[in-house]
């Protein structure tokens, strides 16, 4: 049985709130905010059906300056967030009262009660979403193959043979080209996901007490159609009375069934990993909820674990840093993000159940004191404008 709020990701709170439109303020008709710069923080308010936007320089204890919310947005249980190379926002959305899920895309700078650019149904219970980070333009003389630009979504669908899976997309598309699933990946309630500069996948297994990394297959390019030369039209034959053949359903690609290239496990201090992020150096940050009912002073209490960037031959041991202790404010973290300056943001809740964002300075370690942002609702996922 999972600790704290992991099982339903705020399901009880969400059920009470997802049927109503956001009540965070009257923003109807506003669709473009200011020029939200790099490092602007976004946070999902899962039981308020909204995305909060925090201006750079928000003071300790401050709240959001803008939001995306309202009936036009189709948000009714936003979960996790990711930005693409155009700074468009992608959201996994799940409504526990209907068990319906959506993938939603919003235009860069969108605020208020806006129509999304894209909505697409998702099967199962989606959680984390991640997109390959933007890379510098390659040198003209470089012979290296370009890194594929991917998007990944952690998903759990109990109706299929292998319910735990990660959906693989070409970034900017809404139909997965493949999925990662089967006995070899050992996925066990995948939660948070991240992609590094080479599009390698990192995924937390909430019930598996580990974090795994995979080298994903490159999507096959879509072939360009060959032009057909024009010819003299032939007379149209008289239609046959035979019934038309039934269309053949397009088969779903067989899941990629591969072993991870490495795993970080309980031997390395993992207990209940939920969220994950990489910094610009590739260091791995894991939001771990710890053991059920373990207090902030317990060695098995909630923590942010930091492991070094992967390199071939590296044997992971204990984390190089561990943010943990009663001064941190950590309680039941669900996501972690690190901006380009190294500032660490954590989605969490207070002991009283209010959503909160904890903020730690670069290099934070041990029982570090956090500053905070207030949230109008339950916070599940975070996103930072690249």
For every predicted segment, state its role.
Residues 2, 14-43, 220-222, 228, ...:
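Bacterial Sec-dependent N-terminal signal peptides
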Residues 24-37, 71-86, 122-142, 146-148, ...:
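Beta-rich, blade/repeat-based domains predominating
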Residues 55-60, 107-112, 170-175, 215-219, ...:
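Short loop/turn segments that connect beta-strands within beta-propeller blades
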Residues 46, 94-96, 155-158, 206-207, ...:
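Short loop/turn segments immediately following the C-termini of beta-strands
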Residues 28-70, 80-81, 89, 104:
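An edge-strand/N-cap motif at the start of beta-rich repeat modules
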Residues 353-386:
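Blade-level signature of beta-propeller repeat domains, shared across WD40, Kelch, NHL, RCC1
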Residues 40-43, 88-91, 138, 150-152, ...:
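Conserved beta-propeller blade signature
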Residues 141-145, 218-256:
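Ser/Thr-rich, Proline-interspersed low-complexity disordered segments
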């Amino acid at each position: 049985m999972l600790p704290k709020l992991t099982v339903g990701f705020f399901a009880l709170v969400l059920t009470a709130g997802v049927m109503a439109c956001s009540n965070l303020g009257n923003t109807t008709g506003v669709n473009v905010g200011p020029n939200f710069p790099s490092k602007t923080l976004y946070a999902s308010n899962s039981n308020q059906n909204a995305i909060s936007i925090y201006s750079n320089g928000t003071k300790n204890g401050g709240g959001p300056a803008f939001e995306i919310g309202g009936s036009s947005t189709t948000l009714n249980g936003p979960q996790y967030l990711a930005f693409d190379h155009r700074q468009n926002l992608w959201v996994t959305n799940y409504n526990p009262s209907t068990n319906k899920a959506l993938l939603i895309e919003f235009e860069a700078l969108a605020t208020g009660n806006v129509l999304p650019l894209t909505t697409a149904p998702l099967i199962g219970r989606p959680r984390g979403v991640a997109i390959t980070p933007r890379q510098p333009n390659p040198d003209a003389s470089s012979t290296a193959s370009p890194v594929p630009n991917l998007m990944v979504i952690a998903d759990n669908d109990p109706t299929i043979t292998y319910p735990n899976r990660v959906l693989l997309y070409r970034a900017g598309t809404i139909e997965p080209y493949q999925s990662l699933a089967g006995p070899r990946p050992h996925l066990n309630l995948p939660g948070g996901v991240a992609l590094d500069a080479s599009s390698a996948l990192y995924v937390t297994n909430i019930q598996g007490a580990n974090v795994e990394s995979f080298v994903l297959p490159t999507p096959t390019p879509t072939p360009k159609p060959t032009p057909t030369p024009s010819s003299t039209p032939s007379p149209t034959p008289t239609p046959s009375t035979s019934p038309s053949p039934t269309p053949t359903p397009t088969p779903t690609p067989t899941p990629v069934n591969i072993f991870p290239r490495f795993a970080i496990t309980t031997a390395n201090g993992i207990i209940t990993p939920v969220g994950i992020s990489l910094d610009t150096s590739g260091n791995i940050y894991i939001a771990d909820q710890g053991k059920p009912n373990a207090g902030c002073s317990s060695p098995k209490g909630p923590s942010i674990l930091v492991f070094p960037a992967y390199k071939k031959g590296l044997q992971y041991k204990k984390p190089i840093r561990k943010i943990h202790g009663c001064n941190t404010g950590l309680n039941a973290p669900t996501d972690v993000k690190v901006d380009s300056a190294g500032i660490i943001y954590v989605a969490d809740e207070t002991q009283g159940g209010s959503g909160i964002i904890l903020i730690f300075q670069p290099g934070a370690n041990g029982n570090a004191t956090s500053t905070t942002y207030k949230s109008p609702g339950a916070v599940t996922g975070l996103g930072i404008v690249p």
